[in-house]
Amino acid sequence: MRVLILGSGVIGTTTAWYLAQSGCEVTVVDRQPASGLETSYANAGQLSFGYTSPWAAPGVPGKAVKWLFEQHAPLSIRPTRDLRQLAWLSQMLRNCTAERYAVNKARMVRLSDYSRDCLNALRASTGLEFEGRQLGTTQLFRTQQQLDAAAQDIEVLAQYGVPYELLSPAQIAQYEPGLAGGGAQMAGALHLPEDQTGDCRLFTQRLADLATQAGVQFRYGQQIERLEHAGGEITGVQIDGRLVTADRYVLALGSYSADLLLSLGLHLPVYPLKGYSLTIPIVDAQRAPTSTVLDESYKIALTRFDERIRVGGMAEVAGFDLSLNPRRRATLEMVVNDLFPGAGDLAQAEFWTGLRPATPDGTPVVGATPYANLFLNTGHGTLGWTMACGSGRYLADLMQGRTPEIDTEGLDVFRYLSTRSTRPHREAA
């Protein structure tokens, strides 16, 4: 079976790997000169299998109003003329109920838990290295209100058997001794021991190298223009003015996936959430984090690499704008100085921004479409790397006619389509 994958970020690359391992003839196309150079380039560095939550949560609408007037707000909305932005925000607000939050979080935890197992198996079989650590995530709560609000998340963790430990303020330094050098006061913390860290770009590019050795063809520097279709199937993809064909197609273009589907009559509610990061050289390892620390107040993660600290977070609903906002850099620097003062050389930090492909309910869109030979793998939001291996393995199983190893309810695009849309019949490969 010939498969054409559109996009070579972490999602497209992991999908290519699993399809190649299944015996498929895989080609990956991307406009960049290498894999992992857009949203995968400098994300927060977290593999957050335990800390998996949708942005659409109870209380967020009220907080969003308050954040409009805060300098270091974790979420900001900059209206554009794109009506899809308004539609996406409206759908997100409808998912901010306790009932919808519980359903959406459960779906996300289910996929993240499976993805952890897939990643561990991948590392064991390939020896893939990406400055990874397996020391967990420590989520910091600055207020008792934040600590109390975590109770619902803990219930979901317990339901799915995800290990966790609640920490008193005195216990936090056992996992992150560098925090003792800062002056921030904490009400407590939640430690998730199975979470991991690493450099997503290194992971993506080194996995692309392994995939190439396994027979995958990567075609870089090529512009994907449109999908051609007839009779309920994709007949090819226009790439740099020529038609490229395959037996089946996978769309893994992140925030840009929705535009390509419009000509098919599919309205995919995936919209960019702009995030920022700083990558800081370490000057004092004793003052630096040992793994990932997540500041609940500012929704910012601080992650330790070998000789660097990656500080990332925040979300701007601002369309496809990739300009660097100096106010966001100031927020990242403020959090670093508050929690780990003197750990890194901020003057040498690399400031970056990327567009995370987000759905209104937080759950990605992975699986079949109304077009018999078109599959989607997008919409992972801030958790693309966390869910990448599980999403890629599940999609490979689905496309090969194998029974997936997890419950796939609510993962595909049909949860957003009208009841008149039907799932196409497919023969096993």
Swiss-Prot record:
Q: In which pathway does it act?
A: Amino-acid degradation; D-alanine degradation; NH(3) and pyruvate from D-alanine: step 1/1
- Record InterPro entries: DadA (IPR023080), FAD-dep_OxRdtase (IPR006076), FAD/NAD-bd_sf (IPR036188)
What cellular component terms from Gene Ontology apply here?
cytoplasm; plasma membrane
Which residues does FAD bind?
3-17
Q: What is its EC number?
A: 1.4.99.-
User: Which keywords does the record carry?
Assistant: FAD, Flavoprotein, Oxidoreductase
Keyword Flavoprotein assigned to the entry: answer is yes
GO BP term, pick one: D-alanine catabolic process
Drop me one GO molecular function for this one: D-amino-acid dehydrogenase activity
Give the cofactors, semicolon-separated.
FAD
Q: Which reaction does it catalyse?
A: a D-alpha-amino acid + A + H2O = a 2-oxocarboxylate + AH2 + NH4(+)
NCBIfam families in the record, alphabetically? PRK00711.1 (NF001933)
Its function, per the record, reads: Oxidative deamination of D-amino acids.
| Family classification | Belongs to the DadA oxidoreductase family.
Name used for this protein in its record: D-amino acid dehydrogenase
Protein species of origin: Xanthomonas campestris pv. campestris (strain 8004)
